[in-house]
Regions:
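Short beta-strand micro-motifs within the conserved protein kinase catalytic domain, predominantly
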Residues: 79-89
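AlphaC helix of the eukaryotic protein kinase fold
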Residues: 49-70
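Activation segment signature within eukaryotic-like protein kinase domains
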Residues: 119-120
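Conserved short submotifs of the Hanks-type protein kinase catalytic core
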Residues: 87-101, 105
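Protein kinase glycine-rich loop
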Residues: 20-27, 31
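Protein kinase catalytic-loop region centered on the HRD/HxD motif
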Residues: 123-135
Length: 332
């Protein structure tokens, strides 16, 4: 794989596209806004900074394209229109154009509980569809949940996705977004849908609090501190109903087999009425159907409301590089 500094990439030539202008640059890719000439449609083009020099890189790009294409029929997954490789061997994906991400939103103003719950229902439903089709996302985080004028939440970036026929666990610390990753991903356990559930619950917590679960400030903790944080209770959120926090704690249990499935999480959120003045019975938990190719975790009863123990993948080949940990932990 050959890396090209993002600022050094010239505007690429993509057949059938015109008016390319940079929307965002990162260590992993550059995203352009463009017009699809044949239909006059505005689109987003993600051009990776690397070139496809070896079979592993080619397989990873194909994995993302196949996973995104397989999922894009869902209303809350970003539409993928086409893929290809530029003349200088940079892979690209042509996708639905969105207005921004929930990482942008949470930096400006945290979401209220009702909006966060509604985003959770939509993305959990996308994960239900994904897991039922043998696709694990593995990088759910605020930067990968986008919004537009016509769609409040869509899941993007299947760059770390695992397909049912490719059950590898080749996610290294360099490509994790640790703020939203469950403890088993640091142990390189076999991929499962439980990791996506954890990441979604951590994301919903973050968009309401303005920072990831258990973090006391916006400063990035050391890796040792981060691992110790998994043993700390997840705090309450001021102004957020305890019942919503309890559901999120349930999804962020340190034991992946104790978390709800994506389907259970979706239904728990969907049945959660957030008027604090209205008494409610505990939400029911049931065992969701188990797809053959993606074994879901085993459910357990909903925990009490009291605390219990418990952005585009950022790829860096040189962890000692200045600024690595800040970008790595925040997923920006």
């Amino acid at each position: 794989m050959t890396e090209t500094p993002p600022g050094a990439l010239p505007v690429p030539y993509v057949p059938g596209m015109s008016g390319l202008s940079v929307m965002a640059r990162g260590g992993y890719a550059t995203v352009y806004r463009a017009t699809q000439d044949s239909v006059g449609r505005d689109v987003a083009i993600k051009v990776e900074n690397r070139t496809l020099d070896n079979p592993r890189d080619q397989a990873r790009f194909l994995r993302e394209a196949r996973a995104a294409g397989r999922m894009s029929s869902h209303p809350h997954v970003v539409d993928l229109f086409d893929v290809g490789v530029t003349v200088d061997q940079h892979p690209y994906l042509i996708m639905e154009l969105c207005d921004g991400s929930y990482l942008d939103r949470m930096r400006v103003s945290p979401l209220d509980p009702v909006e966060a719950r509604d985003v959770g229902i939509k993305i959990a439903d996308a994960l239900v569809h994904s897991h039922a089709n043998g696709v694990l996302h593995r990088d759910v985080k605020p930067a990968n949940i986008l919004y537009s004028e016509f769609n409040a939440a869509v899941l993007a970036d299947f760059g770390l996705a695992v397909l049912g026929e490719m059950r590898d666990s080749s996610v290294t610390l360099e490509v994790l977004t640790p703020a939203y990753a469950p403890p088993e991903m640091f142990r390189h356990d076999s991929p499962s849908g439980a990791a996506d559930v954890y990441a979604l619950c951590a994301t919903l917590y973050a968009v309401m609090s303005g920072r990831p679960p258990r973090w006391e400030s916006n400063r990035s903790p050391s890796i040792l501190t981060l691992m110790d944080l998994f043993n700390h209770p997840i705090p309450e959120l001021p102004g957020v109903p305890e019942r919503l926090v309890a559901v999120l704690r349930y999804g962020m249990d340190n034991d992946p087999t104790a978390r709800p499935t994506a389907e259970q999480l979706r239904d728990l959120l969907n049945n959660l009425h957030l008027d604090p003045s209205t008494p409610q019975p505990p939400p029911a938990v049931y065992r969701a159907p188990r797809p053959n190719h993606v074994p879901p975790p085993r459910p357990r009863p909903i925990p009490p409301s009291t605390p219990t123990l418990d952005e585009t993948p950022t790829v860096h080949n040189n962890p000692d590089r200045k600024g690595f940990f800040q970008k790595w932990f925040f997923g920006g």
